[in-house]
Amino acid sequence: MAKITKKQKALAGKVDSNKLYPLADAIGIVKEAATAKFDESIDVAVQLGIDAKKSDQVVRGAVVLPNGTGKTKRVAVFAQGAKAEEAKAAGADIVGMDDLAAMVKAGDMPFDVVIAAPDAMRVVGTLGQILGPRGLMPNPKVGTVTPDVATAVKNAKAGQVQFRVDKAGIVHGTIGRRSFDNDKLQGNLAALIDALVKAKPATSKGVYLRKVAVSSTMGLGVRVDTQTIAAS
């Protein structure tokens, strides 16, 4: 268990768990409490007003964070011919078909994102039991099964993040690192919230953005006033 520092204890005592803080203040508090020796990630949890048990209310998608995530993503692409060349030119780290499938089956997966051209799904489809549990299975809903593999690669490299609501109706994501300027973190969160709003199911009733909280890897969490996000 991580040791709580005196600084974190002092900050925790000042933070009201029931108060909604303006986004700028919330991020400032979280960054101040992020005292680990590494560059902690700044994370967000968004509770949505949906019933995650209903298939027509599953919120899923992808968004390119304008200021990146602070992490360089390694991208693998299943493609052949001209599409393979386009993927390589766009900066894909690994491109292949049957040879790439063999790597996956052998447990050799040195990548964070998998993209596939539509005609490659005959190969990728056999890898579902391996890629699926790792969150790597390409899906057209998040833009990772697409004829435009070059754009998909560029988006992944530029800081695209995928999101999917969990069984409790919460979306978890990372909006950057402690080393990011506050305005960049605010911009990234605003982009994620905008994407979530656009992905709102037609059958969702009542308040959609119920709770938003930001936190760091090892630090405390702070609730955010959603009315201050759009203006950030």
From Swiss-Prot:
Return the SUPFAM superfamilies for the record: Ribosomal protein L1
What CDD domains does UniProt report for this protein, alphabetically? Ribosomal_L1
Molecular-function annotations in GO: rRNA binding; structural constituent of ribosome; tRNA binding
Instruction: Return the GO cellular component terms, semicolon-separated.
Output: cytosolic large ribosomal subunit
Which UniProt keyword terms apply here?
Repressor, Ribonucleoprotein, Ribosomal protein, RNA-binding, rRNA-binding, Translation regulation, tRNA-binding
* One GO term of the biological process aspect: translation
Q: How does it assemble?
A: Part of the 50S ribosomal subunit.
Q: Which HAMAP family match?
A: Ribosomal_uL1_B
| Role noted for this protein | Binds directly to 23S rRNA. The L1 stalk is quite mobile in the ribosome, and is involved in E site tRNA release. Protein L1 is also a translational repressor protein, it controls the translation of the L11 operon by binding to its mRNA.
Similarity comment: family membership: Belongs to the universal ribosomal protein uL1 family.
Q: What is this protein called?
A: Large ribosomal subunit protein uL1
Q: Which organism is it from?
A: Variovorax paradoxus (strain S110)
